[in-house]
């Protein structure tokens, strides 16, 4: 990811990024498992990358937005939020699950050095590890704590994870790759613009 070390974001730029991420999460979270895959995992990863440090409070606000969207969707269907099968004791483990995604993005931003190839390698590693931890927390907490699972066993949990893991990973990779592409395009445009300004200034 070229330009990470020298990329300094203004408060306005960070606010714009936060707004875009919040809208993407809200817009896709409404459609859980529908035609548009939920981007929540990727949103927290990308937010950790761009908003770590002085904007870390954005994590709590994104969590609040996620809960609000769930509340609106469930009650909009005429159902009781607290009695919905998704809102089991495992629901609150999403704090830790999404925290893993945020931490993955923050780690990438903090420790990336070297070439673009090395950056992409670290991106792949951070995303794989954080998404896997996120999945184990969210899937495991639901399997072991939700009343939806009648008979629990370790073998059953492993089988259940096998059914869902790659789908969630694929969705996260898809959205993060899209964000990476946008990052590279914008970085290139900014460098081109900066170079044009310098050339114009010399004239």
Task: Provide a role label for each language-model segment.
Residues 1-6:
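Short, Lys/Arg-enriched N-terminal segments with co-localized hydrophobic residues
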Residues 7-51, 55-60:
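Hydrophobic transmembrane alpha-helices
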Residues 15-20, 56-60, 91-96, 120-128, ...:
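Hydrophobic alpha-helical transmembrane segments
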Residues 25, 66, 70, 102, ...:
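Alpha-helical transmembrane segments of multi-pass membrane proteins
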Residues 27-28, 46-54, 100-113, 181-190:
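Structural signal for the C-terminal ends of transmembrane alpha-helices
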Residues 29-37, 64-101:
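Interfacial aromatic-anchored transmembrane helix boundaries in multi-pass membrane proteins
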Residues 40-44, 93-101, 175-179:
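Hydrophobic core segments of transmembrane alpha-helices in multi-pass, intramembrane catalytic enzymes
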Residues 107-195, 199-201:
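Membrane-embedded alpha-helical hairpins and interfacial helices in multi-pass inner-membrane proteins
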């Amino acid at each position: 990811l070229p330009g990470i070390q020298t990329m300094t974001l203004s408060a306005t730029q960070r606010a714009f990024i936060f707004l875009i991420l919040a809208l993407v999460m809200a817009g896709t979270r409404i459609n859980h498992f529908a035609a548009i895959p939920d981007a929540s995992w990727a949103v927290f990863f990308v937010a950790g990358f761009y908003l770590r440090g002085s904007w870390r409070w954005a994590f709590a606000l994104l969590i609040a937005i996620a809960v609000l969207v769930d509340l609106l969707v469930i009650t909009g269907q005429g159902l009781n939020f607290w009695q919905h099968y998704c809102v089991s004791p495992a629901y609150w483990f999403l704090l830790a699950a999404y925290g893993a995604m945020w931490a993955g993005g923050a780690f990438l931003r903090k420790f990336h050095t070297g070439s673009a190839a090395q950056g992409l390698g670290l991106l792949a590693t951070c995303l794989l590890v954080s998404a896997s931890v996120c999945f184990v927390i969210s899937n495991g907490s639901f399997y072991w704590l939700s009343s939806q699972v009648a008979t629990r066993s370790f073998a059953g949990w492993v089988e259940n994870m096998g059914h869902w893991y790659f789908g969630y990973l694929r969705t996260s990779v898809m959205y993060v790759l899209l964000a990476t592409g946008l990052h590279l395009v914008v970085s290139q445009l900014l460098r081109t613009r900066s170079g044009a300004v310098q050339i114009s200034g010399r004239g």
